[in-house]
């Protein structure tokens, strides 16, 4: 018989650095999930990834206090900042430019994020990534 799902929890955790301190510990603890078990499993799963990369994770927890988790790709903003080599986006996106990014870089990001985006094809995914870039104050070139 299948386990009965008690709920789902969405978190964004840095790769390889899940620990029981806030915000992870309290979020899992109040739902009765074994915090250390999650931290060990998550850190093992993200061992090969770039340390500190923000990873969205969806945790499904069951009534018997067990859990499973699904990791997604890092946010588009993380990829954009990394490709444009900037620390943060523009505080006034319409007026001040934070940097620039090429269409080829946008295509690379769209291909990496394709399975997480709600897009039918690569052009749709590129349009979404391009919109995110503009809202961060990045100039799209080429």
UniProtKB/Swiss-Prot annotation:
SMART domains: RL11 (SM00649). GO terms for molecular function: large ribosomal subunit rRNA binding; structural constituent of ribosome. Part of the ribosomal stalk of the 50S ribosomal subunit. Interacts with L10 and the large rRNA to form the base of the stalk. L10 forms an elongated spine to which L12 dimers bind in a sequential fashion forming a multimeric L10(L12)X complex. One of its GO terms (cellular component) is cytosolic large ribosomal subunit. Belongs to the universal ribosomal protein uL11 family. Pfam families: Ribosomal_L11, Ribosomal_L11_N. It comes from the Bacteria. Forms part of the ribosomal stalk which helps the ribosome interact with GTP-bound translation factors. One or more lysine residues are methylated. Keywords: Methylation, Ribonucleoprotein, Ribosomal protein, RNA-binding, rRNA-binding. This is Large ribosomal subunit protein uL11. One of its GO terms (biological process) is translation.
């Amino acid at each position: 018989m299948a386990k009965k799902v008690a709920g789902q929890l969405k978190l964004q955790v840095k790769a390889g650095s899940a620990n029981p301190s806030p915000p992870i510990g309290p979020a899992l603890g109040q739902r009765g999930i074994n915090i250390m078990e999650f931290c060990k499993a998550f850190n093992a799963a993200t061992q090969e990834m770039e340390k500190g990369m923000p990873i969205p994770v969806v945790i499904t927890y069951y009534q018997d206090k067990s859990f499973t988790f699904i990791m997604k790709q890092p946010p588009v903003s993380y990829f954009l900042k990394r490709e444009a080599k900037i620390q943060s986006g523009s505080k006034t996106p319409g007026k001040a430019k934070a940097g620039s990014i090429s269409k080829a870089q946008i295509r690379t990001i769209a291909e990496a994020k394709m399975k997480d985006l709600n897009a039918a094809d690569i052009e749709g995914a590129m349009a979404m990534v391009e919109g995110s870039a503009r809202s961060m104050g990045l100039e799209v070139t080429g």
